[in-house]
Structure formats: structure tokens, C-alpha cells
Curated annotation (Swiss-Prot):
Cellular component annotations (GO), alphabetically ordered: cytoplasm; nucleoid
Domain SpoVT-AbrB: 5-52, 81-124
Protein name (record): Transcriptional regulator MraZ
CDD domains: MraZ_C, MraZ_N
The keyword DNA-binding is annotated on this UniProt entry: yes
Family: Belongs to the MraZ family.
GO biological process: negative regulation of DNA-templated transcription initiation
Subunit: Forms oligomers.
Keyword Transcription regulation belongs to the record: yes
Localization annotation: Cytoplasm, Nucleoid
Gene Ontology MF terms: DNA-binding transcription factor activity; transcription cis-regulatory region binding
Length: 151
């Protein structure tokens, strides 16, 4: 499981270094093979170990193709998916088109989301984190299904 938020630098060639604390798990789960695609809701990228992505692809494949919203989601996620591999130094190249979509430039946040990571522009992530915290603290903002969650 991937958790935590990590500030990392995007180099001039568009490469990011995966923090070492995640590398062993990525190696064991998918031999360092990753898939990056756009997030269909937020202005960020989703980075999956190949084994996790294959589960998502199977679910997308099984969607009814006569529904336009299903085809749209398939086009967005699968059409923008790119295979990546960690190099010997634990780096991977984020394709220019995807960097542009997420507005990634120099400082990037790699955010663990249990089965995947999100890649955010650092300023966008900080603004969202502040907004999320303010929103969840408002009275009545907690969804019913979370009210009984024990932390």
C-alpha cells in the first residue's frame, strides 16, 4: 500500500525519482513496471503498478460500450495510459503531454493513494490540501458512511 505525500523534483528531461521507500514494493508487485494516465476528475496524473492497472483495465473492458459516458471514460483513461519502467536509479520519464495536462513543472507531489499514486503540481496540491481540510471541518460536511469510522 502506498501512503504519504512526497515533494520531489522533476528534472529538465521530465524525469522523477521514485522515493526509495516505495521501490521494493514496486519491484515485487510489478518488476518496476508502471502505468501513468490522467485522472479523469482532478488535474493530476495517476501512477499505477502494472498489476493494479491490469485490474482497472479489466473493469473498463467490461463496461457497456453503448453508453457514451463509459466510452468517454475508456478513451480518457486508456487512451492516455503510458507504460513506464523505473530505471536503475529509480527514475521514470513523465511524457510531455501528460506533464502538460497536470501542469507539472519542477516541484511535484507524489501522493500515495493506497493502490496507486497521484502526481500533482506542488502548488496545486497545497491549495487542494488546504481546501479539503477547510471543507471537511465544516459542520455537516462528513459523509454518513464515514461518521462511524474509527481512526
Amino acid at each position: 500500500m502506498f501512503r504519504g505525500a512526497n515533494a520531489i523534483n522533476l528534472d529538465a528531461k521530465g524525469r522523477l525519482a521514485m522515493p526509495s521507500r516505495y521501490r521494493d514494493e514496486l519491484d515485487s508487485r510489478s518488476a518496476g513496471q508502471l502505468i501513468v494516465t490522467i485522472d479523469a476528475v482532478d488535474p493530476c496524473l495517476c501512477l499505477y503498478p502494472l498489476s493494479e492497472w491490469e485490474l482497472i483495465e479489466a473493469k473498463l473492458r467490461d463496461l457497456a460500450t453503448f453508453r457514451e459516458e463509459n466510452r468517454r471514460l475508456q478513451r480518457l483513461l486508456i487512451g492516455n495510459a503510458v507504460d513506464l519502467e523505473l530505471d536503475g536509479s529509480g527514475r521514470f520519464l513523465v511524457p510531455p503531454r501528460l506533464r502538460e495536462y497536470a501542469k507539472l513543472d519542477k516541484r511535484v507531489m507524489l501522493v500515495g493513494q493506497l493502490n496507486k499514486f497521484q502526481l500533482w503540481d506542488e502548488d496545486a496540491w497545497n491549495a487542494l490540501a488546504d481546501a479539503d481540510l477547510a471543507a471537511i471541518q465544516k459542520p455537516g460536511a462528513m459523509p454518513d458512511e464515514l461518521r462511524d469510522l474509527i481512526l
